[in-house]
Amino acid sequence: MNNFYLEIPSIKRKEDIIDYINELEQYNSEINGIELLAKILDGYSFEETLENCLKRSNKEYAIKNGKNQVNTYLLIRKSDNKIVGAINIRLNYGSGINKFNGNIGYGIRPTERRKGYNKINLYLGLLEAEKLGLEKVTLACESTNIASIKIIESLGGILNYSEIDPSDGNLTNIYIINVKETINKYKNI
């Protein structure tokens, strides 16, 4: 875990972020953890998406605009300074948290998968969630996503219930993680 850290997106990472998003698109991969910045795929400029991303991480802005606060982070590998993943933490101040999204969304770029990085990504995200005052978080994943299920459960996630997501018709598992308990129990991952 000491080989990775989370970083708030910035203009200095513009090319790296665009490369990360393009890789997700190239592999037809779901865009998780970096949705606000992925608006570049809809024709918005990087600068516009970055500005919106940073605004959405501000509690006052979220409350004023009736939106959820969304804090987005990039998972950086220290050895080569490469973005290998992303995670966002959603706090409810306005429109409510969609139970099929949960408090946390996260993902790893396709060329870096199956290396154990997403467990580190989620753990570091839980550290940020604790700083934001979250005691428990909900995470959602499709019931067929075995990799995500294993990651969530390996960090103490407890299946709360499963339900059909009306947006896509897929059975979705909703998990709860006790933030402090998980941080203390798994700090040596």
PLM-predicted stretches and their roles:
Residues 1-103, 168-189:
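GNAT-family acyltransferases
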Residues 16, 121, 147:
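Charged catalytic carboxylate motif
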Residues 81, 116, 145:
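Conserved G/P- and acidic residue-centered "switch" motifs that form tight phosphate/ATP-binding loops
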Residues 105-108, 114-127, 150-154:
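Conserved acetyl-CoA-binding loop-helix of GNAT-fold acetyltransferases
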Residues 113, 139-149:
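Conserved beta-strand-loop-alpha-helix junction that forms the acyl-donor binding cleft
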Residues 132, 154-155:
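Structural motif
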Residues 140-141, 156-174:
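Conserved catalytic-core motifs of GNAT/GCN5-like acyltransferases
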